[in-house]
Amino acid sequence: MKLIIGLGNPGTEYDGTRHNIGFAVADALAAHHNASFSKEKGRYLSAKIKLGSESVGIIKPMTYMNHSGHAVVAAMNFYKVARTEIVVICDDLNLPVGTMRLRPKGSAGGQNGLKHIIECFGSNEFARLRIGIGSQNMPKGGFSSFVLGKFSEQEKSEIAIMTVSARDCAIDFALHGLGHAMNHFNTSKL
Protein backbone atom coordinates (compact mmCIF):
# COMPACT_ATOMS: atom_id res chain seq x y z
CA MET A 1 0.00 0.00 0.00
CA LYS A 2 1.07 3.57 -0.72
CA LEU A 3 -0.10 6.83 0.85
CA ILE A 4 -0.36 10.07 -1.10
CA ILE A 5 -0.63 12.90 1.40
CA GLY A 6 -1.72 16.37 0.33
CA LEU A 7 -1.01 19.12 2.87
CA GLY A 8 -3.28 22.08 3.51
CA ASN A 9 -5.57 23.72 6.03
CA PRO A 10 -9.13 22.51 6.64
CA GLY A 11 -12.03 24.90 6.10
CA THR A 12 -13.64 26.46 3.05
CA GLU A 13 -11.92 29.79 3.75
CA TYR A 14 -8.64 28.12 2.69
CA ASP A 15 -9.95 26.57 -0.54
CA GLY A 16 -7.96 27.79 -3.52
CA THR A 17 -5.15 29.31 -1.46
CA ARG A 18 -1.48 28.84 -2.24
CA HIS A 19 -0.92 26.91 1.00
CA ASN A 20 -3.65 24.40 0.05
CA ILE A 21 -2.17 23.23 -3.24
CA GLY A 22 -1.53 19.82 -1.62
CA PHE A 23 -5.25 19.47 -0.88
CA ALA A 24 -6.03 20.51 -4.47
CA VAL A 25 -3.83 17.71 -5.84
CA ALA A 26 -5.36 15.17 -3.43
CA ASP A 27 -8.84 16.28 -4.52
CA ALA A 28 -7.86 16.01 -8.21
CA LEU A 29 -6.49 12.50 -7.67
CA ALA A 30 -9.62 11.35 -5.84
CA ALA A 31 -11.91 12.92 -8.46
CA HIS A 32 -9.92 11.31 -11.29
CA HIS A 33 -10.70 7.91 -9.74
CA ASN A 34 -14.28 8.70 -8.64
CA ALA A 35 -13.28 8.30 -4.98
CA SER A 36 -14.68 10.28 -2.08
CA PHE A 37 -13.12 11.25 1.23
CA SER A 38 -14.27 10.02 4.61
CA LYS A 39 -13.16 11.12 8.06
CA GLU A 40 -10.73 8.82 9.86
CA LYS A 41 -10.51 9.27 13.63
CA GLY A 42 -10.76 13.06 13.38
CA ARG A 43 -7.17 13.69 12.30
CA TYR A 44 -7.44 13.23 8.54
CA LEU A 45 -9.71 12.55 5.61
CA SER A 46 -8.95 9.55 3.44
CA ALA A 47 -10.02 8.20 0.08
CA LYS A 48 -9.01 4.78 -1.15
CA ILE A 49 -8.25 3.91 -4.76
CA LYS A 50 -6.74 1.01 -6.65
CA LEU A 51 -3.97 1.63 -9.20
CA GLY A 52 -3.33 -1.63 -11.00
CA SER A 53 -2.66 -4.07 -8.17
CA GLU A 54 -1.58 -1.28 -5.78
CA SER A 55 -3.91 -0.04 -3.03
CA VAL A 56 -3.48 3.69 -2.45
CA GLY A 57 -4.75 5.89 0.34
CA ILE A 58 -5.16 9.59 -0.42
CA ILE A 59 -4.79 11.53 2.82
CA LYS A 60 -5.75 15.12 3.75
CA PRO A 61 -4.67 16.06 7.30
CA MET A 62 -7.33 17.96 9.26
CA THR A 63 -4.85 19.20 11.88
CA TYR A 64 -3.92 22.47 10.13
CA MET A 65 -0.62 22.80 8.30
CA ASN A 66 1.63 23.39 11.31
CA HIS A 67 0.52 20.12 12.95
CA SER A 68 0.40 17.90 9.86
CA GLY A 69 2.82 15.39 11.36
CA HIS A 70 0.24 14.11 13.85
CA ALA A 71 -2.20 13.21 11.07
CA VAL A 72 0.51 11.72 8.84
CA VAL A 73 1.78 9.47 11.65
CA ALA A 74 -1.81 8.44 12.51
CA ALA A 75 -2.53 7.52 8.87
CA MET A 76 0.74 5.61 8.51
CA ASN A 77 0.03 3.65 11.71
CA PHE A 78 -3.56 2.90 10.66
CA TYR A 79 -2.54 1.66 7.21
CA LYS A 80 0.73 0.08 8.45
CA VAL A 81 2.78 1.97 5.87
CA ALA A 82 6.51 2.76 6.07
CA ARG A 83 8.03 6.15 5.24
CA THR A 84 9.32 4.70 1.96
CA GLU A 85 5.71 4.15 0.85
CA ILE A 86 4.49 7.75 1.18
CA VAL A 87 4.76 10.96 -0.78
CA VAL A 88 3.83 14.29 0.80
CA ILE A 89 2.53 17.01 -1.55
CA CYS A 90 2.92 20.63 -0.46
CA ASP A 91 3.46 24.20 -1.57
CA ASP A 92 6.94 25.67 -2.01
CA LEU A 93 7.39 29.40 -1.77
CA ASN A 94 10.84 29.23 -3.37
CA LEU A 95 9.74 27.54 -6.59
CA PRO A 96 8.08 29.60 -9.31
CA VAL A 97 4.45 28.92 -10.19
CA GLY A 98 4.38 26.22 -12.87
CA THR A 99 7.21 24.13 -11.41
CA MET A 100 7.36 21.12 -9.15
CA ARG A 101 10.14 19.03 -7.63
CA LEU A 102 9.96 15.47 -6.34
CA ARG A 103 12.70 14.56 -3.86
CA PRO A 104 13.45 11.48 -1.73
CA LYS A 105 14.41 13.56 1.34
CA GLY A 106 15.50 17.03 2.39
CA SER A 107 14.93 19.91 4.72
CA ALA A 108 11.61 21.55 5.41
CA GLY A 109 12.75 24.58 3.41
CA GLY A 110 10.54 26.87 5.48
CA GLN A 111 7.40 24.78 4.90
CA ASN A 112 5.85 24.30 8.35
CA GLY A 113 3.86 21.19 7.44
CA LEU A 114 7.04 19.44 6.31
CA LYS A 115 8.84 20.76 9.38
CA HIS A 116 6.28 19.16 11.70
CA ILE A 117 6.35 15.86 9.81
CA ILE A 118 10.16 15.80 10.10
CA GLU A 119 9.85 16.50 13.85
CA CYS A 120 7.30 13.70 14.30
CA PHE A 121 9.36 11.21 12.26
CA GLY A 122 12.72 12.24 13.71
CA SER A 123 13.91 12.03 10.10
CA ASN A 124 13.73 13.95 6.84
CA GLU A 125 13.86 10.76 4.77
CA PHE A 126 10.49 10.62 3.05
CA ALA A 127 9.44 11.61 -0.46
CA ARG A 128 7.96 15.05 -0.98
CA LEU A 129 6.51 16.69 -4.05
CA ARG A 130 6.92 20.45 -3.78
CA ILE A 131 4.72 22.60 -5.98
CA GLY A 132 5.85 26.14 -6.76
CA ILE A 133 3.60 28.91 -5.50
CA GLY A 134 6.10 31.67 -6.41
CA SER A 135 7.36 34.36 -4.09
CA GLN A 136 8.40 36.94 -6.67
CA ASN A 137 5.15 38.88 -6.15
CA MET A 138 5.12 38.58 -2.36
CA PRO A 139 4.96 41.91 -0.54
CA LYS A 140 7.79 42.47 1.94
CA GLY A 141 6.80 41.05 5.33
CA GLY A 142 3.61 39.59 3.87
CA PHE A 143 4.46 35.89 4.18
CA SER A 144 1.27 34.73 5.93
CA SER A 145 -1.13 36.73 3.80
CA PHE A 146 0.71 35.58 0.66
CA VAL A 147 0.61 31.82 1.35
CA LEU A 148 -2.96 32.07 2.65
CA GLY A 149 -3.96 34.19 -0.35
CA LYS A 150 -5.49 32.99 -3.59
CA PHE A 151 -3.68 32.65 -6.90
CA SER A 152 -3.95 35.51 -9.38
CA GLU A 153 -6.04 35.01 -12.51
CA GLN A 154 -2.85 34.63 -14.54
CA GLU A 155 -1.47 32.01 -12.12
CA LYS A 156 -4.70 29.98 -12.06
CA SER A 157 -4.18 28.54 -15.56
CA GLU A 158 -0.63 27.44 -14.68
CA ILE A 159 -1.84 25.96 -11.40
CA ALA A 160 -4.59 24.00 -13.20
CA ILE A 161 -1.94 22.41 -15.45
CA MET A 162 0.41 21.84 -12.51
CA THR A 163 -2.35 20.19 -10.45
CA VAL A 164 -2.90 17.61 -13.21
CA SER A 165 0.87 17.06 -13.57
CA ALA A 166 1.26 16.61 -9.80
CA ARG A 167 -1.69 14.20 -9.76
CA ASP A 168 -0.05 12.17 -12.53
CA CYS A 169 3.30 12.27 -10.69
CA ALA A 170 1.63 10.84 -7.57
CA ILE A 171 0.07 8.07 -9.67
CA ASP A 172 3.48 7.31 -11.21
CA PHE A 173 5.04 7.18 -7.73
CA ALA A 174 2.42 4.67 -6.57
CA LEU A 175 2.71 2.48 -9.68
CA HIS A 176 6.42 2.65 -10.54
CA GLY A 177 8.28 4.06 -7.53
CA LEU A 178 10.08 7.23 -6.58
CA GLY A 179 13.00 7.00 -9.02
CA HIS A 180 10.74 6.52 -12.02
CA ALA A 181 8.48 9.40 -10.99
CA MET A 182 11.47 11.70 -10.41
CA ASN A 183 12.86 10.91 -13.86
CA HIS A 184 9.55 11.64 -15.56
CA PHE A 185 8.13 14.57 -13.62
CA ASN A 186 10.86 16.80 -12.19
CA THR A 187 10.59 19.96 -14.24
CA SER A 188 12.15 23.34 -14.65
CA LYS A 189 8.89 24.81 -15.99
CA LEU A 190 5.86 23.22 -17.62
Curated annotation (Swiss-Prot):
Site (Stabilizes the basic form of H active site to accept a proton): D91
UniProt subcellular location: Cytoplasm
Keyword tRNA-binding belongs to the record: yes
Active site per database record: H19 (proton acceptor)
EC number: 3.1.1.29
BP-aspect Gene Ontology terms: protein quality control for misfolded or incompletely synthesized proteins; rescue of stalled ribosome
Main location: cytoplasm
Subunit structure: Monomer.
Protein name (record): Peptidyl-tRNA hydrolase
Organism name: Chlorobium chlorochromatii (strain CaD3)
